[in-house]
Structures are given as structure tokens and as C-alpha cells.
């Protein structure tokens, strides 16, 4: 009898039509972090932090960089004889200088405001070298004897190519008065210098005059230099020193020189023919004959990601630099595939609903339905809610970029030895800015991930509520994301539930009768259980009374119990 009842129950269950609401799941192992959780496995995720580069120096948008090899910027601009390959250079996208280039100031000394000049070069893409005071024009001074073994060329003493070291001629050094008027339409970079002899003897041997000066004047510059004669240690075999200076001469402005000795005169100047975004990078990386839109000192970045952690100094169309090691954006749902548990599967397929886990069988949408009826079973994605969700997450990366559209740029400023405290302060400020920038990026990703996952959960709940409000009491909520119909629901009926056109009145009478039938079965079962309970109680009491009476008679017969009547 029990087997028959169980079989009838199974048949009844099989015949029950069901519809379940669930979400997509897959075999993804991608994980993201949120505000509340770490390492949440999701169906889809997008890494938004670029961590790789090609390890090469590349052309930037088709324009080659100026790679100075073993020359410094000072060696290039002054014309160190070992830097002759850079006498005339084409347009550059950025400048590359080694950390400690061998060919710097061959004659020992100092380049004043060198760091400021480098900063100026970060906004220039092309120089045109022009002659402003020909070497042959110094008829009253020796213009070819100013050479040094510290600046050798092909085994002989030489000097910087772009300036002239003027020496006395015929034991005389007449006072120099020279001017140059910038008739060009472009700004002009002009360089000059002063020589500081080792002693008085060298001073008179080279310049005849024991007391000398150099005066330089423009509309914005008023400078007077005097040599500093002192005994010094030898550098590159020289006890003397040279200081070099520069200025930007505006169009229609003139530069005036006056000197009676120790003058390093300009022969060539640099016309600034093209300004634009550039940079001076300290790098030991080799040129790779490649092209890129973003260059760092470590190598080129070719990426569409919004962030990178390669190097703070970049040039070009680059991702934003952060110190993070991981920035992964959730674009899909929590990934919790339904477990293969026999008791949870149901008889018509892998239906677990959104509480127990996602469906790997639903591949054409993020949210949807699984139905089962006499015509069969199957999955169907909810196109409308899926498309809205896709539209929402598609704009997520752009949203993050918009929220962080003001990037702090570490421009790689340089400081001289007298500015070390400023340099240290600048580094601390840059590090502080980058720390804040990184924190903001990480926090934004965590918040967006939390919002995305909550958004998906909300969409599933909304879909569930949409079905629940349609079916009302025509179906029973099973508590796992599924509804069991109280009426027959064929494929057309299932489709009406999915598209929101379910006709509740059409099925309400059939559902009411089914509910009453189920209630009657329950009441009948309760009545049967009550009869069986009463019968069991009476029978048990009767048996107990007979046993007590029998025991009493036995005890009376053997004298163990006195019986009085």
C-alpha cells in the first residue's frame, strides 16, 4: 500500500508544471574584490590595469625619438666632439638620455639652470641650428687656439662645436662688443660661457688682461660675469673650469655681449621651429624599430586599459599610472554554478533557481527562465533585462575614466645639487599624490564591483517579482526561485509568463479547483491519521488492561497476592 501511495505522489510531481527564474553561470575562475568581500568569483571580469610593456624605445605616432646614446643633453647642445652625430637632428617625439652619459661637459665645469633647460626641452619637438656669430669674424682674437685635450677628436685636442673659446692675439685682448638681433619669427636658444683659470699666470697667458669681465644683456636679461681664479683638483686633466649659460631670445629682440677676456662666445644658436609635448627620459633601453602611442622609460605600452603600473613618467596617449598590483572590474554576475546534488536537481533537469546557484545551460543571456511541462523543458533568456544589464556594464570603464579624468603627471623634474631639499620635497609630494591617486582608483573599482554585483542580484529579484505578481495564487512558490503551477501550463502559457502577458483569469478556476483538491487530500489524510490514532490508543489500552488482569489472577493462584471478594 505504501509503495502505491509513493508511486502516485511521484506521478503527481512529474505532472506538475513549473517555471524557475535563474541566472547564467559558467566555468570562469576570474575573481574580483568588492568593498565587502575579497576574491569573489564572477562569470565575467575585465582587467583594467596594464602590467606589461615591450622593453623597447619606439617611435611615437610615427615620429622617431632623439636617442642621445652616450651623449648628454649638454654635450649635444654645446657640441661635444664625441657627439658629432647629433650636429643636426630631425624632429623628435621625445629625447632619451642615459643616467650617466659618458660624453657630457668634456671640459669640466657647470651648465647653469641646466634642469630648467631640460624642462624647456620637454615642450619642444624640433631645433634648427643657425650660425649667429661666425667663427671667422673674430679677427682681433684667436678663435682656433681655444682647444683642450679634455675634448679630444681623432687623437687631437678640440673643443665644443657650437661655441668659440676666444684667446688673446698678438699679446692683446681688445674689448669685445658684439650684438645679434633675432630677425626670425621663432624663439632662439643662445648659449655662451666663461672660463675660470687655475691661477694668475694662466689668466695672463690666455687673456693678457689680469682683471676681466663678461656682460650680457637682452630686453629681459642683465648679467655680468667675472672669472674665479683658484687652485683646483684636476678633472679630465684640467684645473680650470667653465660655466655655461643660456637664454631664450625672442623675435625682434637683441642680445649684446661685452668682454675683455675669458669669454666663450656663441657661434651657433638653436631656432625653436616646433613646440609640442615631448619629454626627456632617463633610460638604458635600446631602440626597437617599432611604433607606439605610449612610451615609458621601461618600454612601450600598447594597451586600451585605463590604468598601468609600469612607470610614472610617460609620453603619448597613455593609461593613467597607479601603484596598484591589481585592478579587476566585474562585468558579469557572481559565478556559483549549480552543484550536482541529486536531491536538489528535480526530475526534469538542472533547476536550482537563483538561490541555489546559476545555470550553465543558459548561454544566450544573463537572466532567464527554465520551464517544465508535458511538452518538455528548456531554458529561455530574458532579453530585455539582459540587454539593459549589458548596456549598463558596457559603459563602466568609460565611467571610471570620466570619474578620474584629471591625472596627476609625474614629469620627471631634475634638480641641481643646491636644490636637494626641494628635490626631496618634490619626490614626497609626487609620491603622496600618486598614493592618493592609487587609493582613489582602487576604492572606485571596489565600489563599482559592489554596485555591479548588487545590480545583478536586483535584476534577478525583479524578474522573480515580475513572475510572482503575474501568477499570484495560480502557482505555488517553492522557495528556490521556482513556481509550481496549480493548472496546466503549455509552452504558449509559459511564453506568456515570460513576456508579461500571462492571463490570470483564464487559469484561475482550474487553479482554484486544484488547490481545493490538494486541500481535500490534506484534510482526508488528517482525518485518517486521527482515526488511526484513536484506534491505536483504544487498542493499546485494552491490551494493557488484559495483561494487568491476567497478572493479578496468576499472583492470586500462587498465593503471592491475597484476593478478597
UniProtKB/Swiss-Prot annotation:
The keyword Hydrolase does not apply. The record marks 345-346 as: Cleavage. Glycans are attached at residues 26-27, 39, 181, 302, 499. InterPro entries: Capsid_hemagglutn, Hemagglutn_HA1_a/b_dom_sf, Hemagglutn_influenz_A, Hemagglutn_influenz_A/B. GO terms for cellular component: host cell plasma membrane; membrane; viral envelope; virion membrane. Residues 552-565 are cytoplasmic. Gene3D superfamilies: 3.90.20.10, 3.90.209.20. The keyword Disulfide bond applies. Residues 1-16 form the signal peptide. Keywords: Clathrin- and caveolin-independent endocytosis of virus by host, Clathrin-mediated endocytosis of virus by host, Disulfide bond, Fusion of virus membrane with host endosomal membrane, Fusion of virus membrane with host membrane, Glycoprotein, Hemagglutinin, Host cell membrane, Host membrane, Host-virus interaction, Lipoprotein, Membrane, Palmitate, Signal, Transmembrane, Transmembrane helix, Viral attachment to host cell, Viral envelope protein, Viral penetration into host cytoplasm, Virion, Virus endocytosis by host, Virus entry into host cell. Binds to sialic acid-containing receptors on the cell surface, bringing about the attachment of the virus particle to the cell. This attachment induces virion internalization either through clathrin-dependent endocytosis or through clathrin- and caveolin-independent pathway. Plays a major role in the determination of host range restriction and virulence. Class I viral fusion protein. Responsible for penetration of the virus into the cell cytoplasm by mediating the fusion of the membrane of the endocytosed virus particle with the endosomal membrane. This is Hemagglutinin.
Amino acid at each position: 500500500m505504501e509503495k502505491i501511495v509513493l508511486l502516485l505522489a511521484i506521478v503527481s510531481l512529474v505532472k506538475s508544471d513549473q517555471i524557475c527564474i535563474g541566472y547564467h553561470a559558467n566555468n570562469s575562475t576570474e575573481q574580483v574584490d568588492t568593498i565587502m568581500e575579497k576574491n569573489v568569483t564572477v562569470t565575467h571580469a575585465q582587467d583594467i590595469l596594464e602590467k606589461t610593456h615591450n622593453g623597447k624605445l619606439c617611435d611615437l605616432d610615427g615620429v622617431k625619438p632623439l636617442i642621445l646614446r652616450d651623449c648628454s643633453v649638454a654635450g649635444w647642445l654645446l657640441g661635444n666632439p664625441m657627439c658629432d652625430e647629433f650636429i643636426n637632428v630631425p624632429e623628435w617625439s621625445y629625447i632619451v638620455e642615459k643616467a650617466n652619459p659618458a660624453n657630457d661637459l668634456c671640459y669640466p665645469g657647470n651648465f647653469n639652470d641646466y634642469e630648467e633647460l631640460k624642462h624647456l626641452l620637454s615642450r619642444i619637438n624640433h631645433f634648427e641650428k643657425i650660425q649667429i656669430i661666425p667663427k671667422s669674424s673674430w679677427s682681433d682674437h684667436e678663435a682656433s687656439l681655444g682647444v683642450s685635450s679634455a675634448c679630444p677628436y681623432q687623437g687631437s685636442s678640440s673643443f665644443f662645436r657650437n661655441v668659440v673659446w676666444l684667446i688673446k692675439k698678438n699679446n692683446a685682448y681688445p674689448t669685445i662688443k658684439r650684438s645679434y638681433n633675432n630677425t626670425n619669427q621663432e624663439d632662439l636658444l643662445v648659449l655662451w660661457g666663461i672660463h675660470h683659470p687655475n691661477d694668475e699666470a694662466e689668466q695672463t697667458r690666455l687673456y693678457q688682461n689680469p682683471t676681466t669681465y663678461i656682460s650680457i644683456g637682452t630686453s629681459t636679461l642683465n648679467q655680468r660675469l667675472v672669472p674665479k681664479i683658484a687652485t683646483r683638483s684636476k678633472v679630465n686633466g684640467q684645473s680650470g673650469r667653465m660655466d655655461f649659460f643660456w637664454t631664450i631670445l625672442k623675435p625682434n629682440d637683441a642680445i649684446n655681449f661685452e668682454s675683455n677676456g675669458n669669454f666663450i662666445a656663441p657661434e651657433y644658436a638653436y631656432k625653436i621651429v616646433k613646440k609640442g609635448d615631448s619629454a626627456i627620459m632617463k633610460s638604458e633601453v635600446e631602440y626597437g624599430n617599432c611604433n607606439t602611442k605610449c612610451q615609458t622609460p621601461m618600454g612601450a605600452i600598447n594597451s586600451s586599459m585605463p590604468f598601468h603600473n609600469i612607470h610614472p613618467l610617460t609620453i603619448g596617449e597613455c593609461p593613467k599610472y597607479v601603484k596598484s598590483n591589481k585592478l579587476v572590474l566585474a562585468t558579469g554576475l557572481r559565478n556559483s554554478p549549480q552543484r550536482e546534488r541529486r536531491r536538489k536537481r528535480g526530475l526534469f533537469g538542472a533547476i536550482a533557481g537563483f538561490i541555489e546557484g546559476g545555470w550553465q545551460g543558459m548561454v544566450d543571456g544573463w537572466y532567464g527562465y527554465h520551464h517544465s511541462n508535458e511538452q518538455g523543458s528548456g531554458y529561455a533568456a530574458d532579453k530585455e533585462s539582459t540587454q539593459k544589464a549589458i548596456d549598463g556594464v558596457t559603459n563602466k570603464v568609460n565611467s571610471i575614466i570620466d570619474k578620474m579624468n584629471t591625472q596627476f603627471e609625474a614629469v620627471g623634474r631634475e634638480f641641481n645639487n643646491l636644490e636637494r631639499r626641494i628635490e626631496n620635497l618634490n619626490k614626497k609630494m609626487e609620491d603622496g599624490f600618486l598614493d592618493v591617486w592609487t587609493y582613489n582608483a582602487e576604492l572606485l573599482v571596489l565600489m563599482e564591483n559592489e554596485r555591479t554585483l548588487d545590480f545583478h542580484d536586483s535584476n534577478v529579484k525583479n524578474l522573480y517579482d515580475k513572475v510572482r505578481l503575474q501568477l499570484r495564487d495560480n502557482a505555488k512558490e517553492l522557495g528556490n526561485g521556482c513556481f509550481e503551477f496549480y493548472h496546466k501550463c503549455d509552452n504558449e502559457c509559459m511564453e506568456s509568463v515570460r513576456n508579461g502577458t500571462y492571463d490570470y483569469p483564464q487559469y484561475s478556476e482550474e487553479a482554484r479547483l486544484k488547490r481545493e483538491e490538494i486541500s481535500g487530500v490534506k484534510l482526508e489524510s488528517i482525518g485518517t491519521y486521527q482515526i488511526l490514532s484513536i484506534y491505536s490508543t483504544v487498542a493499546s489500552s485494552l491490551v494493557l488492561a488484559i495483561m494487568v488482569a491476567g497478572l493479578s489472577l496468576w499472583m492470586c493462584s500462587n498465593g503471592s497476592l491475597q484476593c478478597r471478594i
